[in-house]
Amino acid sequence: MKTLFIINDPPYGTERVYNALRLAPALVKKDPGHEVTVFLMADGVLAAKANQKTPEGFYNVERMLKRVLAGKGQVLLCGTCMDARGITDAELMQGARRSTMDELADTTIAADKVLVF
């Protein structure tokens, strides 16, 4: 089974990203062969910035994305969205990478389920 998560919201300020990134590793835990891809778009690309510092006791989206990667998932970012926000490849957390609409289209076609947050 392949699930694609498309995340549009900023990493903090709403709980959409938080909830998406809680569900992604839960799917892999229930089904170890489950393939998860997280595609970050719009303000969602900010979720993959390296070295996030959140208050003690507050969730950290970078750590949550690392759990996706540890479960053999992928974290892809819309390159156009990155450019619009002045985010460079060097600012990304390890394992996350710039992507394209063509790759998103291919990933969408290959996915069994697509969840949009």
Give the role of each language-model region.
Residues V17-K30, V38:
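Histidine-anchored nucleotide/phosphate-binding helix
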Residues T54-T80:
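A glycine-rich helix N-cap at a beta->alpha junction
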Residues N51-E56, L92-Q94:
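Short glycine-enriched, charge-decorated loop/helix-capping segments at active-site entrances
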Residues D9-P11, A42-L46, C81-A84:
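Acidic, glycine-rich active-site loops and adjacent beta-strand->loop/helix elements
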Residues A84-F117:
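C-terminal structural segments of small proteins and small subunits
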Residues A24, V36-A42, V75-G79:
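Short internal beta-strands
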Residues K30-A48:
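Small/aliphatic-rich secondary-structure junction motif
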Residues F5-A20, A48-K53:
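Short, glycine-rich nucleotide/cofactor-binding loops
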